Amino acid sequence: MEDPIFGGAVVYVCEHNEKGVLGVVINKPTDMTMEVLFDRIDLKLSEGLRSAVVDEPIMFGGPVQDDRGFVLHTPGGRFSSSLTVTDEVAFTTSIDVLEAVASGAGPERMLVSIGYAGWSPGQLEEELLRNGWLTVGADAHVLFDLPILLFFIRVTLSWLALWSLLQLRRYNHAFFDSLH
C-alpha cells in the first residue's frame, strides 16, 4: 500500500462490527518510550520495574485520536475500559492499566500505542477487495514476543506462503486438467 500512514503497516484488528473496524498499528514505533510516557502522565514506575519497561517504545497506533493512549495486553486485571479481543489479548483505553503497570500489578505483556486505526462500515472491506491489504492470522506471540522489525517480515512471509500454495494449487489443476 502506497500510503504515508499505512504503507508497510501491520494492523492488529481489535473489533469489527456493524459500526466499522478498530485496529492498532503494531510495527511503527514512535520516538517516545515508556519512560517518557510515564513522565508525561505523572506516573512513577516502581524501581524494580524501571529496567524492564523504561526503554520499550510507544507505537504509532494510527491517525485516529492520536493524542490518546491505547494498550494491547494479555488479559487479567479489572480495567475500566477494556475489550476482550481474544482469550490471549485485551484492548484497554483507560489510564488504570498504566497505573497498574507502574505499581507492578499490570498485565504480563503489553504493547502501548498512541492513536488507533479506524474504518467506517464497509470501508475496510472495500480496501480488501481492491487488494489494499494482506490478511493473516495473528496471536499473542506476534503482538508481544516478536521484535518490531520482524512483524512485517513474518506477516509478509505468511502471505507469501499462502500465495505460493494458491499458485501451486492453480498449477496442479492446470496440469491435471491437461491430462484429460
Walk through the language-model features, giving the residues of each.
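A short aromatic-anchored loop/beta-hairpin motif
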Residues: M1-H180
